[in-house]
From Swiss-Prot:
GO terms for cellular component: cytosol. Belongs to the UPF0301 (AlgH) family. Gene3D superfamilies: VC0467-like. InterPro entries: AlgH-like (IPR003774). This is UPF0301 protein SCO2948. Pfam families: DUF179. HAMAP family: UPF0301. It comes from Streptomyces coelicolor (strain ATCC BAA-471 / A3(2) / M145).
Length: 193
């Protein structure tokens, strides 16, 4: 697990649930942290697709949504709200950000879903729509990290748009070095092992 030298250093990173994390909202979850500071943390779960098509709730954005084209459950907070997260190729460089997109980390950013989709269409490489988000109050995430509930790892732009979100937990762990890569082989139900 990575150490934290400053509170803001986790924005843009992934929280990967450890096998010991028992909360059903976060079992084998991969959470992209969109904001992390002394006031708390906010992120979205990248590997919880729902059966709801993006076009059913945000018709104008459906054409930009990456496969599988469904809304993802971003977390247990504010399930009636939608968040858009998009990868803008070249967005990590110093280029001017497209209108309607705010950089979070590298090429990953938040989309203003009130903006006309055609403003972003030429720039967006991948878009995911999330219903709800994961939120932590001041110090709450740090406590969970101390308790060993999460691994903190670097994100990659492809994590946001993985076409196989059900594999993301294992894929993210496999690309880590050392013992952490072995966690990817942990069985779904250790009692059957």
């Amino acid at each position: 697990m990575s150490g934290m030298t400053e509170v803001s250093s986790l924005t843009g990173r992934l929280l990967v649930a450890t096998p010991a994390l028992a909360d059903p909202n976060f079992e084998r979850a991969v959470v992209l942290l969109l904001d992390h500071d002394e006031e708390g943390s906010l992120g979205v779960v990248l590997n919880r697709p729902t059966p709801v098509d993006v076009g059913d709730i945000l018709e104008d954005w459906a054409d930009l949504a990456g496969e599988p084209g469904v809304v993802f459950q971003g977390g247990p907070v504010s399930l009636d709200s939608a968040l858009g997260v998009a990868v803008v190729p070249g967005g990590a460089s110093g280029e001017r950000a497209p209108l309607g997109w705010r950089r979070v980390h590298g090429a990953i950013g938040l989309v203003d879903l009130e903006a006309p989709p055609e403003l972003l269409a030429p720039a967006v490489g991948a878009l995911r729509i999330f219903a709800g988000y994961a939120g932590w109050g001041p110090g709450q995430l740090e406590d969970e990290l101390t308790e060993g509930a999460w691994y903190v790892v670097e994100s990659e732009p492809g994590d946001v748009s993985s076409p196989f979100p059900e594999r993301l937990w294992r894929e993210v762990l496999r690309r880590q070095r050392g013992d952490l890569a072995m966690v990817a082989t942990y069985p779904d139900d250790p009692s059957l092992n």
